[in-house]
Amino acid sequence: MIDPDGYRPNVGIVLIRRDGQVFWGRRVRRDGWQFPQGGMHSDETPVEAMYRELNEETGLLPEHVQLVGATPGWLRYRLPSQAVRCNRSQMCIGQKQVWFLLQLIGDESHVQLDQSENPEFDHWRWVSFWYPIEHVVMFKRSVYARALCQLASLAQQVVGLEVGTMPQYVQDICLLNVGYKHLPNWVSRY
């Protein structure tokens, strides 16, 4: 399913513990790490897609998490030119995502990465809230910064304290629509 602008509807998941650490998964047979995410089926709402992807990629069920909130709208990112795909007559140039913040309320032993026929992750760990922005594949960094910026106040409610200091470049990215003078080099490339 690709929208008329060439973006594939998708959901992203930030799974947070009470101590402010977030789930970080290593992609199978790759060295890349990322949050759980996945495409929506044409008959799904974003919430339905989120719970399906959560189970497929982490093994967690709705009773293991609490839905804290979501980004207010779609966040888009473009794929690098070598990753642009054609699906029948449609070209997919990127993804548009609704990002969800979930609090883990079950035991982390419920995390099982082998719940689907084609697991997404082969390893996982907990990392600090802002860590993923600098460690995800380059073309997703801006969307990760925007998602975490929009979810940070909700995350602070879960944690009950600061989720760490928002790096200056993240603040810059969060205000990207206004126009900037001093963005990190990688932002201008995507």
Curated annotation (Swiss-Prot):
EC class name: hydrolase
Originating species: Xylella fastidiosa (strain Temecula1 / ATCC 700964)
Cofactor: a divalent metal cation
Function (record text): Accelerates the degradation of transcripts by removing pyrophosphate from the 5'-end of triphosphorylated RNA, leading to a more labile monophosphorylated state that can stimulate subsequent ribonuclease cleavage.
Name of the protein in its database record: RNA pyrophosphohydrolase
Transmembrane segments: none
HAMAP family tied to this protein: Nudix_RppH
InterPro entries hit by this protein: NUDIX_hydrolase-like_dom_sf, NUDIX_hydrolase_CS, NUDIX_hydrolase_dom, RppH
EC numbers on record: 3.6.1.-
SUPFAM superfamilies: Nudix
Sorted UniProt keywords: Hydrolase
One family name in Pfam for this protein: NUDIX
Motif Nudix box positions after renumbering to this chain: 38-59
Lineage of source species: Bacteria, Pseudomonadati, Pseudomonadota, Gammaproteobacteria, Lysobacterales
Family: Belongs to the Nudix hydrolase family. RppH subfamily.
GO MF terms held by the record: pyrophosphatase activity
Nudix hydrolase domain boundaries: 6-149
PROSITE patterns: NUDIX, NUDIX_BOX
